């Protein structure tokens, strides 16, 4: 994929991931600022280890990957920042040196969404 293809979709996907994790953190009584997905997720894991592990397992069960969850998370941690400022030569160089595999973010966002949906829409488990 060329770095400029589907930039809006990639930025929105990364931003959704950030907002969903921040929502989980907020529901756990923690406020956090910043765009680094890895930092946000690790903060959530320290508070809700079991739920975070379930989400990670859900993500990995949907991916065929040669990398661990942590490696993929680390690789995609700055996607929002890098793609949002794509016109910046430094960001473009970063994207070229570290190409995105968007399937991880797609699956991660969906898994977090499912977790939030269970907590917010159907907290008692009855659908």
Predicted regions and their residues:
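A short acidic (Asp/Glu
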Residues: 22-25, 37
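Long, charged low-complexity segments
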Residues: 29-127
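Charged alpha-helical initiation segments
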Residues: 1-11, 24-28
């Amino acid at each position: 994929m060329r770095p400029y293809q589907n930039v809006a979709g990639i930025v929105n996907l990364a931003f959704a991931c950030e907002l969903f994790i921040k929502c989980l953190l907020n529901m756990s009584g923690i406020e956090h600022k910043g765009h680094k997905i890895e930092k946000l997720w690790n903060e959530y894991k320290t508070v809700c280890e079991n739920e975070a592990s379930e989400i990670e397992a859900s993500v990995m069960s949907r991916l065929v990957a040669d990398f661990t969850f942590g490696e993929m998370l680390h690789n995609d941690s700055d996607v929002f920042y890098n793609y949002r400022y794509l016109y910046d030569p430094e960001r473009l160089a970063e994207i070229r040196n570290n190409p995105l595999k968007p399937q991880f973010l797609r699956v991660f966002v969906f898994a977090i969404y499912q977790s939030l949906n269970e907590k917010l829409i159907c907290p008692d488990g009855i659908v």
